[in-house]
Amino acid sequence: MSKKALLMILDGWGLGDQKKDDVIFNTPTPYWDYLMNNYPHSQLQASGENVGLPDGQMGNSEVGHLNIGAGRVVYQDLVKINRACADNSILQNPEIVSAFSYAKENGKSVHFMGLTSNGGVHSSMVHLFKLCDISKEYGIDNTFIHCFMDGRDTDPKSGKGFIEELSAHCEKSAGKIASIIGRYYAMDRDKRWERVKEAYDLLVNGQGKKATDMVQAMQESYDEGVTDEFIKPIVNANCDGTIKEGDVVIFFNYRNDRAKELTVVLTQQDMPEAGMHTIPGLQYYCMTPYDASFKGVHILFDKENVANTLGEYIASKGLNQLHIAETEKYAHVTFFFNGGRETPFDNEDRILVPSPKVATYDLKPEMSAYEVKDKLVDAINENKYDFIVVNFANGDMVGHTGIYEAIEKAVVAVDACVKDVIEAAKAQDYEAIIIADHGNADRALNEDGTPNTAHSLNPVPCVYVTGNKAAKVEDGRLADVAPTILKIMGLEAPADMNGQILIK
């Protein structure tokens, strides 16, 4: 039997420990309580390996909506590369083979550059160590490492320890630390080309403070009051590790935003006014796709094409769908939900409600929830859509402020909106699944009572609003939502979706 389906995503609405830190539990939510008492519900895992992230890593809205829409676990870049390093399949990666074979056959140097820290946001030391090992295996003596120091995703003076770790690994593997510079210069993303020039001059022209002991040079920088992020260019005086014509460069950052500008000046665009010119014949490898417009660069781990998402599949059946959210979460119910696709599918309507223009959302905890609700109720009453997905942003966006009283107000607003939407949906014969993409408002305090502004690792709810009194809903993970929606709609899930159907 086929029904129209409504998928409601309450952003940041996890299932907490029901103690003081759990604002959702501690705030009066009469309609949520009614749903819990009258409809089948279960828990979904929304973090770590269940959503394609490393074990123990909290989920986020981008990853959450990607998994929800895909109907399968979508492995994130970090996990894909970790796996390739662990099972040695990286050795068969055709781009790795081409890079190291070319260097060996042509007597060229190999350069690894990237953020040298264990912050886990832009790069991984594990990947760098593996690259050193591959260089050793190919017998490439001229292997140079250019270290961009962190201090943002790590402690501001942790960099010296990372340089020590890397030096120790190079002793038994391959590679020499040729240069060091702070990410402030090497990883700018705001077109401050004068900063990028500092990194360019270091890498290409060997301009910087000469040092024979790179660990000692880090300590000297600290002694001068300059911490990791802002480390001025340091050159290893014991070797010439500058990047030359025809060399191999592997930029081992897997996150793209702060890897673009340096890539531009080395490979894409001459900037004579800034004294920066691209290097002829450079064999340049990016860990992941940094920018679709880049020409002549190699990509070690290409973007996974997520085909047959929930939105695409519903469109292929000639059905009508609506995606609605306020600005803060609009990209999540469109671009991410549709597998990283910007353009709407056939018969896919979108409603964007502007988020309020306030400095921080504790100043307006209800955000634009009531406006989203009003537009959604109107759309439901049009009786035009076979499938609707909506996101209410409050639990997450107000949760990030860490201000308890504001989060309480956000929860109250969401509860009121859920009521109006679900009652309208029931009246128009929709069945609804209510979930969250990850937790946040369910853990507003740390153990010591200080505000917690981060996402939680808690599971999230899955409520099945149906007229079928015998219905049950099983525990699962976010990847199980799309096949479950299709079941409600009387459609068989495509083979690409390996998530489980949760309703029985």
Curated annotation (Swiss-Prot):
Pathway in which this enzyme or protein is active: Carbohydrate degradation; glycolysis; pyruvate from D-glyceraldehyde 3-phosphate: step 3/5
EC assignment: 5.4.2.12
Keyword Metal-binding among record annotations: yes
Keywords: Glycolysis, Isomerase, Manganese, Metal-binding
GO molecular-function terms, A-Z: manganese ion binding; phosphoglycerate mutase activity
CC annotations in GO: cytosol
Binding positions for Mn(2+) 1 per the UniProt entry: D396, H400, H455
Entry keyword annotation includes Coiled coil: no
Catalysis: reaction(s): (2R)-2-phosphoglycerate = (2R)-3-phosphoglycerate
HAMAP family per record: GpmI (MF_01038)
Known role: Catalyzes the interconversion of 2-phosphoglycerate and 3-phosphoglycerate.
Oligomer status and interactors: Monomer.
Protein name per Swiss-Prot or TrEMBL: 2,3-bisphosphoglycerate-independent phosphoglycerate mutase
Protein source organism: Bacteroides thetaiotaomicron (strain ATCC 29148 / DSM 2079 / JCM 5827 / CCUG 10774 / NCTC 10582 / VPI-5482 / E50)
